[in-house]
Amino acid sequence: MPSEYASKIPTLIPLEKAGPKGYIRMVFPLELGDSYDADEIFGILKQGLEAAKERAPTLGCEGIPDTEAKQAGVLKAHKYNDYDTIIKKDLRAPGAFSHTYADIKAKGFPLAAFNGDLLCRRFTWPSPGERLPAADLQANFIPGGLIITGCFFHVFGDAKTYYTWLETWAEECRRLQGETGPRNEIPDEFFTDREKHMKPSGRNAGKPEDHSESNWRL
C-alpha cells in the first residue's frame, strides 16, 4: 500500500525555498529494435507515471507563488490535474531526427546527437509566465529506440529525489507488464523527516562564530 503521506501535498523546507528556480535536464536512451508499437509503449509509460504520482506526491505538483510567505518570490507546491506530465513525440519519419538508435549507440551516445530544443520540453531556465511542474517528461520515439528526457525542477528535489521518482516510475511500468511481488515502498521517513527541518529545534543558536570549521576564507 502507498504511504499514508502520499496523498498529502508536501510543504517546502527552507532549503528548497532557497534553491535555484531552474531545471535539471536528463536523457535516458532505450533500445527497442526496428518494429515496436509506440502507442502501446507510451500507454505503459503514462499509466506507470500516474501510478508513481500516487506514491510520490511531489511528482504530480507544480510550483506556484506562496502568497502567505513573508519573502517575495517564494514558491509552494500545488497538485495539478490539468497538465500532462509526459508527452509523446514521434521522430521516426524520414528527416524528423538525424540519427537511428543504432547510430547513436555505435558512436558512444555523443552529446551532439541529443538536440535539447527538439528532445526536451523546456530550457534550463523557465520563461516568465511558464508553469513550473516538478517533472516535465517527453518520450521521443526514434528509429530503433526511445529517448526519454526529463526536466526536473530543482526547487522540488535533488539527485536522490529524482532517482526515487524514476525508480518508482520504472517499477510501476514493470508491474503493468506483469511483474508481481511486493512494491519497493518509499519509506515514511522520506515524508515525516521533512517536518524536522521546518523550524529550529532551539537546542543550538546557529551562530556562524560557533562553527569555525565552516568559516574558511580562501
Model-derived segments and spans:
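Non-catalytic N-terminal regions of enzymes
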Residues: 1-207
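Flexible, P/S/T/G-rich "lid" or insertion loops adjacent to the active sites of thioester-utilizing
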Residues: 204-218
